[in-house]
């Protein structure tokens, strides 16, 4: 089993797809990496030679931010927005949509599950 950037790649998948299991690498970037290292994208992970795995590993480590480093970078960027008090930072802090989406209805994914609010009791009509 090939281990790249701390992730075990699935053995039976094509290397082009297997690389997408690494956080920060999608299909386009996977194809880019394979073109740089001259590895056939249709090769199965289990059929890769040690030299191929080493070439891919060094390409990923030297030229791309992936996994923990990328997650840390994203968290620091969001924290910076919150610290300097930008509109986007405030939206992140409040757990609301950041990019201008409506919130009167929808936005359930970002806001979470509905919490019911106890309504006022109707006062009995006095006549």
Swiss-Prot record:
Protein name as catalogued: Small ribosomal subunit protein uS13
UniProt cross-references to PANTHER family, sorted A to Z: 30S RIBOSOMAL PROTEIN S13/40S RIBOSOMAL PROTEIN S18 (PTHR10871), SMALL RIBOSOMAL SUBUNIT PROTEIN US13M (PTHR10871:SF1)
Sequence ranges of Basic residues compositional bias: 101-127
Gene Ontology MF term list: rRNA binding; structural constituent of ribosome; tRNA binding
One Pfam family it belongs to: Ribosomal_S13
Subunit structure: Part of the 30S ribosomal subunit. Forms a loose heterodimer with protein S19. Forms two bridges to the 50S subunit in the 70S ribosome.
InterPro entries in alphabetical order: Rbsml_uS13_C, Ribosomal_uS13, Ribosomal_uS13-like_H2TH, Ribosomal_uS13_bac-type, Ribosomal_uS13_CS
Transmembrane segments: none
Keyword tags: Ribonucleoprotein, Ribosomal protein, RNA-binding, rRNA-binding, tRNA-binding
Entry's family note: Belongs to the universal ribosomal protein uS13 family.
Keyword Zinc: no
Residue numbers spanned by region Disordered: 92-127
Taxonomic lineage from the root: Bacteria, Bacillati, Cyanobacteriota, Cyanophyceae, Oscillatoriophycideae
UniProt record, GO biological process: translation
Function per UniProt: Located at the top of the head of the 30S subunit, it contacts several helices of the 16S rRNA. In the 70S ribosome it contacts the 23S rRNA (bridge B1a) and protein L5 of the 50S subunit (bridge B1b), connecting the 2 subunits; these bridges are implicated in subunit movement. Contacts the tRNAs in the A and P-sites.
Cellular component aspect of the GO annotation: cytosol; small ribosomal subunit
């Amino acid at each position: 089993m090939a281990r790249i950037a701390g992730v075990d790649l699935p053995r039976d998948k094509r290397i082009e797809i297997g690389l997408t299991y690494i956080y920060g690498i999608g299909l386009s970037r996977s194809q880019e990496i394979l073109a740089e290292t001259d590895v056939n994208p249709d090769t199965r992970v289990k059929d890769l030679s040690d030299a191929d795995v080493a070439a891919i590993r060094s390409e990923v480590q030297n030229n791309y931010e992936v996994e923990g480093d990328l997650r840390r970078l994203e968290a620091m960027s969001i924290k910076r927005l919150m610290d300097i008090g930008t509109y986007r930072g405030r939206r992140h802090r409040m757990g609301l949509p950041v990019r201008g989406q409506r919130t009167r209805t929808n936005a359930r994914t970002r806001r979470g599950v509905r919490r019911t609010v106890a309504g006022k009791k109707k006062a009995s009509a006095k006549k």
